[in-house]
A protein has these predicted regions:
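Activation-segment/catalytic-loop signature of the eukaryotic protein kinase fold
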Residues: 83
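Conserved N-lobe ATP-binding subsite of Hanks-type protein kinase domains
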Residues: 30
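Conserved N-lobe loop of protein kinases adjacent to the ATP-binding glycine-rich P-loop
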Residues: 35-43
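Conserved N-lobe beta3->alphaC-helix segment of eukaryotic protein kinase catalytic domains
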Residues: 43, 48-72
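Activation segment signature within eukaryotic-like protein kinase domains
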Residues: 148-149
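Protein kinase catalytic-loop region centered on the HRD/HxD motif
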Residues: 152-164
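Conserved short submotifs of the Hanks-type protein kinase catalytic core
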Residues: 88-101, 105
């Protein structure tokens, strides 16, 4: 964890990252996409928690989430890169998952918002439609659902091996990531997103 200056940067910078735009909002936090100041291609999601809005219990939950994520390294669990404390905020620098969450994916029948990038198109969309087409009248492709479930089981089993119970597994807390080279080498289909379990505020 990193101690920041007593004031948050007025130019939209947190630590070594420049805030690009807001990608999410909660009752006591905003989430931004951000890029590294000297490596623009290096993206993170910055969860900026307003200290004044935290009750003692919420602060305890947040500190518990930070502690758990610092000790977790698994393909299907979102990665915490750093944590920066200022007088007004607690900033969690998280792995950036451009595919949004599973609830959006289900609601939009697989047609998720475009992955970030100048190309402006989801690189998985066309391949998914051709190789793993979703049912015409609702629902998701069976093979894709099986993959999502297998990935979730892998994450939950890992958490149980660490005596951790998430306690808030739901589609909104399952983020979608583009498969990396390591996953592809292990046989993960390139057309199917990786599931990343997020939001450990209620975990014990």
């Amino acid at each position: 964890m990193t101690e920041g200056s007593s004031q948050d940067n007025s130019q939209g910078q947190v630590g070594e990252y420049v805030l690009d735009h807001e990608i999410g909002k909660g009752s006591f936090a905003l989430v931004y996409r951000a890029h590294h100041i000297s490596k623009p291609e290096q993206l993170v999601a910055v969860k900026s928690v307003v200290r004044q809005k935290l009750s003692p219990k919420l602060l305890e939950n947040l500190e518990g989430e930070i502690s758990i994520l610092k000790s977790m390294r698994h393909t299907n669990i979102v990665d915490l890169r750093d944590c920066i404390y200022t007088d007004e905020h607690i900033h969690l620098m998280m792995e950036y998952c451009p595919g949004g969450d599973l609830s959006q994916y289900i609601r939009m029948h697989g047609n998720v918002a475009p992955w970030d990038g100048d190309a402006g198109a989801n690189p998985l969309a066309a391949a998914q439609r051709s190789k793993f087409p979703h049912p015409e009248y609702g629902g998701l492709n069976e093979q894709m659902v099986r993959s999502f479930l297998a990935q979730l089981v892998s994450a939950v089993r890992f958490l149980r091996s660490k005596d951790i119970v998430h306690r808030d597994i739901k589609p909104q807390n399952l983020l979608l990531q583009i498969p990396d080279d390591e996953c592809l080498a292990s046989g993960h289909p390139p057309e199917i997103p990786l599931i990343k379990v997020a939001d450990f505020g209620f975990a014990r």
